[in-house]
Amino acid sequence: MQAIRNQLLIVFVLSLTLVGCFSGNSAENSLAGLNSNNIKRLVNLYFTYQQQNNWEGPEDEEAFKAFIREYSPRKLERIGIDPAKTDELFVNERDGEPFQIRYGVKGSMMGCSKPVVFESVGIDGKKMIGFLDNSEREVGQSEFDDLWQGGADGEEAARDRDNS
């Protein structure tokens, strides 16, 4: 009976140790998950720009890059960006090409799902698009063209796709 108690005590202590090891950085892990690639990082920085500028997106690449360069280096590091290499953020990891970004997109305090970051080349005829609601979706050229022209936001495009 004593041996069983000792084994249960060991299992209990190990369980507490493991829970402590994995729960300590949950906020950091969540933040990292929301910024797992350059599309998501750019979308989140675009949204942050909007928050600080009356929900208007940056007017051009120069304004966006200036905003990122002036952003807190500590906050950039927390989302996986080397503050000394912010230009690398504008290159897609999947295809190695620069992103296309829709500048001047109006956001909303209530949230919106407008597309703002686009793969320029993509893979196998499909291109990833990053939306202001922090989602990303791989689309074909026709949907890409519609979203790039601002013809639909992410929700409208998804409804249209589901209804066809």
Regions from the PLM with identified roles:
Residues 111-116:
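Short, hydrophobic/aromatic-rich segments at coil-to-beta transitions
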Residues 21-93, 100-104, 108-109, 135-163:
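Conserved hydrophobic/amphipathic alpha-helical signal-anchor segments
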Residues 7-20:
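Bacterial N-terminal signal peptides
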